[in-house]
């Protein structure tokens, strides 16, 4: 094999941790926005309010989807790193 796969486990682990942190930050934004939206319900009524709250619910649903995707990306990166390290250790034992 002329082009072996190389990786820096420390950098990959840092990346996975950073991605998880970003998902946590987005979750905080989601929670704050959701709480503030719900707090408006007692002060905002009528046809305009219904449209507003439906739009907010749709936006929050999209944001939650993004958070879930980013969180999954961080977890997947971490699992792949663990598997790569395990494979490297196993192969080293074969020689």
Swiss-Prot record:
Official protein name in the record: ESAT-6-like protein EsxC
Higher taxonomy: Bacteria, Bacillati, Actinomycetota, Actinomycetes, Mycobacteriales
Any Gene Ontology CC annotation: extracellular region
Protein family: Belongs to the WXG100 family. ESAT-6 subfamily.
Alphabetical keyword list: Secreted
Chief place where the protein resides: secreted
Organism of provenance: Mycolicibacterium paratuberculosis (strain ATCC BAA-968 / K-10) (Mycobacterium paratuberculosis)
Any Pfam family the entry gives: WXG100
Cellular compartment(s): Secreted
